[in-house]
Design a protein with these regions (language model features):
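Beta-lactam-recognizing serine transpeptidase/beta-lactamase-like catalytic domain environment
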Residues: 1-44, 49-207
Length: 207
């Protein structure tokens, strides 16, 4: 099932060329197979991966509490915002991982993504994204779904894919523009950054 819909009866038996041409010109692209050929950021569905990475690496425990301060400043400017701060100016206050998933607290997962890069000398954004990439791959977010239909492949947030994306728009981009940053990591941790998947890929991940 895909949306917007169209009348299949016009495209069988006596094929309606005029109707088909109208569909091709329709700005809503009704002929696009959206489950397999429309990619979007995974958004908050991704937070379960960040949670699992944090728990299995010992970065947090089920009882670890993080205080939502609204603006996450440790990754530099522009400061990342929790959705509730953007909408109301408020915060979720102290939350553990289960509560953070329940209320979809962005701040908790910014902090957790940042902590995944913790080292004796501070935060290492490459360490953090390497860990997240391992868990993304474990859930199949680095590969096609395997359905026997033509589909778009995933775009997994990673240093290599960031560099590729930046240079697509700016072939002369400098190293400072293409390098992976803490800001990229924390946005990846909530399913943003350059994460891009079809509905079918997200369905496979959560199934």
């Amino acid at each position: 099932v895909t949306y917007p819909s169209y009348d299949n009866n016009e495209l069988v038996n006596t094929f309606n060329n005029a109707y088909y041409n109208d569909l091709l010109q329709d700005g809503n692209t009704p002929l696009v197979n959206r489950p397999l050929k429309q990619k979007k950021a995974s958004g908050s569905t991704f937070k379960m991966i960040t949670a699992l990475a944090g728990l299995e690496t010992g970065t947090i425990t089920p009882s670890t509490t993080i205080v939502d301060k609204g603006l996450f400043k440790d990754a530099g400017v522009p400061y990342a915002r929790c959705w509730i701060y953007s909408n109301t100016g408020g915060t979720h206050g102290p939350v553990n991982v289960s509560h953070a998933l329940e209320v979809s607290c962005n701040y908790f997962f910014y902090e957790l993504g940042y902590r995944l890069g913790s080292t004796a000398n501070g935060s290492d954004s490459n360490k953090a994204i390497t860990t997240l990439n391992e868990y993304m791959a474990a859930f199949g977010l680095n590969d096609y779904t395997g359905v026997e239909l033509d589909e778009y492949g995933p775009t997994m947030a990673s240093p290599a894919n960031k560099e590729k994306a930046v240079k697509t728009f700016n072939p002369d981009a400098t190293t400072s523009q293409t390098r992976w940053t803490d800001g990229d990591t924390i946005r990846t941790a909530i399913g943003q950054s350059i994460n891009s998947y079809t509905p079918a890929q997200i369905t496979k991940y959560v199934s």
